[in-house]
Amino acid sequence: MKKADILVLDFGSQYTQLIARRLREQGVYAEILPFNVSLADIKAKEPKGIILSGGPASVYATDAYFCDKGIFDLGLPVLGICYGMQLMAHHYKATVAPAGHKEYGKANIEIKKDSALFKNLPKKQTVWMSHSDKVENLPDGFEVLATSENSPFCVFGNEDKKFFALQFHPEVQHSEFGKNILKNFAKYACNCESVWNMGSFAKTQAEKIREEVGNDKVLCAVSGGVDSSVVAALLASAIKEQVIVVFVDNGLLRSGEKEQVEFMFKNTLGIDLISIDASEIFLSRLANVRDPEQKRKIIGNTFIEVFEEEAKKHKDVKYLAQGTLYTDIIESSVVGASKTIKSHHNVGGLPEKMNLKLIEPLKEIFKDEVRALGLELGLSKEVVYRHPFPGPGLAIRIMGEVNRPSLELLRKVDVILLEELKSTGWYDKTWQAFCVLLNVKSVGVMGDNRTYDNAVCIRVVDASDGMTATFSHLPYEVLENISRRIINEVEGINRVVYDISSKPPATIEWE
């Protein structure tokens, strides 16, 4: 069993993955486990510390989530965050109750006592709160380490036991010294060393792949995006002669995508590629389907069917490799107590019964780590820094039913958006950019004539890992040129809007 420096127990926060990511940025390997993991499994990981995540439940409710109480008797440092903080207080007989004043957003805290958590940090800090419960009294044996205007027990701890509790979320970017607090917990409380990196990850994953696969063969599904390209490169580095790389044209690709993917794998990466045109079957099954969850599940099921049919043509194929990431896992909620945001076609969208076993070597890392891994494996920056493109493709960028006319319309406007962003230098400055066909018509005037045509939405966001995102502040002249070109060059569009929503509350993709 793989060891972990720090274990993060997931109580349902959508930001649980960020805790692990922030620690990994410091070179500390952190792993996430369900909140109800057994004490034996925790001991087997030989952690140097434990973090209890936030979550949507209340410790005083009948449906509260509780970890094994023996965690507090292991002699390990423990850090409780939000719900984890309230859980620690509850365990040590303090009272947790609904807060009269709920806190959501930025708050200012003031450090009241020196602590390992706040080593070399300023006394006053801005942090991110997100809670509706409060700790009403200090647990026995603990002392206040920091306060805020609405939280007199904002941070408390027991330095002897190295138990610490935070009401705020240090893992989100809005907590200005949150990264430092997590680093201090790992370094000064847990005595962790900064030795984890993508080089060591690549080596470990290659060994795991060889051990799991043995002499069998692996079907590797690729889309041309960075995730599947890195998976293919990782498999090739581990078991090159046993990998069959397959690209499926599902009819939901961007303009020129099929040709780009085929060229990249054969000419740039030097990997043999089997290309399958399955557009008819995908589009026929999506006909008259409007619900986004149904779209994702249909696409997921159909992908598996196509891959399983291809596998029958080759001997000893027992595995299917996919580029599932941590962000896919958390949004599809198959870790801990997290609530489902949406199913991903390669997580919640998969059929229950598959003839192929899944290999997902990237499911424990984030997008930025995938890119670092890609560079480590020798992929070009052009491949590694392509904008993310979802597995369900343009199907989840068309509101409502997916059909060929809508796909062609969306492809045309998408080409214009990307051309303008690349020509102005904004493509490389942003995380992701795409258009959404709203399937909503509006009145317009072109020349002397009335029009009643489609509206299209532009979505461009900045992010570091995809877990949170803000809309990109594109210059007005860039937006104006994009809008002008789309309306003038694409028949059937008379209105362009810009999505200025952040994640949360919105997701990056519309469906």
Swiss-Prot record:
Keywords: ATP-binding, Glutamine amidotransferase, GMP biosynthesis, Ligase, Nucleotide-binding, Purine biosynthesis. Residues 5-195 form the Glutamine amidotransferase type-1 domain. It holds the Pfam family NAD_synthase. Pathway: Purine metabolism; GMP biosynthesis; GMP from XMP (L-Gln route): step 1/1. HAMAP family: GMP_synthase. Homodimer. This is GMP synthase [glutamine-hydrolyzing].
